Amino acid sequence: MAAQAGSHGAARVISIILMVVGVLMIVMGATTYAMVSATLAAENIVVSEDACLGGREVAGPLPAYCEAQIIATHSLEATGGKTYAQLDREDPLRAVAMNGSFLRASLFTSVVAFGVSLLVVGLGILFILVGVALLSLAGKKQATAGA
């Protein structure tokens, strides 16, 4: 009986830890999402009209992705379909390709940051649900053991 009471106590502690960690993950994930969004919005980038979501402010993952895609299209059009690596070292269009590549990499980094922050929020929700389930099971087992 004492061993069961100890395991129920441990289950309760673990469930509370899971729920606290879950809440922290949700807060941190949401904060990161908001920070990335605010940083992008502060750049005043507007998606090119000829892109998906044209005319929208880049402050979220979808507009950032659309802008990165159209930058690739414009860079390739400007360089005659050649990438940075394919252009001669002395070709003045190499700078265009390089700038396009850097801009795309920056936008894709923000898209990844949005994705990771949403993943952290989702995992936080999962931690809370597992904690609640564990707490519920520990309570039921304790009630059954006491009967």
Where are these regions (language model features)?
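N-terminal extramembrane/targeting module of integral membrane proteins
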Residues: 1-48, 147
